Amino acid sequence: MIGNLNIANSNRKDTNIKFTKDQEIAVHELIEFLAQPWDDKKYINALCGAGGTGKTFVIKYVINNCKWSGGVIGCAAPTHKACRVLSNSIGGKEVNTIQSLFGFRLDVNIENFDPENPAFNPVGKDKLDGLKVLIIDEASMLNAKLVKYISNKCKKLQIKVIMLGDSSQLPPVNEKTSQAFLIASNTYYLKEVVRQGDNNPISKLLKLLREDIDNKNGWRFLDYISKNRQDYNE
């Protein structure tokens, strides 16, 4: 169990916030990651978890308490809706679409992006100047070629990257898994759902479903449903 967070920034805010064990580990390690000198082999970390485990709660704390000021921390997401949700969750900080941040023009289909085969010269002026940290939400939506492009671009500019998302969500089109989490040198998992009460039957159901997906076995989920039908009847 981690005690007080002893990190590079001694002027931490929100010192009375309580974290789950997984959240505390993620907060400590991500702030430490951002405090470390640049490393060409360790510049991408990831934070994974289902909805309600507190990914944006954790990342808001990291933004407010890491060594970098908000002006050099960029945030992005694949869709405008995801941008709005993330912005609202982290106190109104600006969040750009990946297309806008990296200078991809409107003719780019984000799901089938291929920088080696660009249609109509899609790469324009990016908005990465001065950034030291880039946080990307809904990273499971990014296909392998887009992840590679982002990785290479950020490596060239020495921008550290934190990928956020749910590794159990549907992968990008024609891919079995999202490379966004595989490319990370360290990945931190949030497993405890805190948005719903412990006695909520839906919470239990979702937990079993995720475990069956991870284990490639659907029997526990189905068995639980058959034995607890009354909990889900109207």
Where would I find each of the regions flagged by the language model?
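The conserved Walker
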Residues: 51
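Loop/turn-to-beta-strand initiation segments
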Residues: 72, 130-133, 157-162
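Short, conserved "post-DEAD/DEAH" coupling segment immediately C-terminal to helicase motif II
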Residues: 144-159, 177-179
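Inter-Walker segment of RecA-like/P-loop motor cores
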Residues: 74-130
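Conserved helicase motor core of P-loop NTPases
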Residues: 3-5, 11, 26-33, 38-45, ...
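Hydrophobic positions on the alpha1 helix immediately C-terminal to the Walker A/P-loop
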Residues: 58, 62
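Walker B catalytic acidic pair
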Residues: 137-138, 165-167
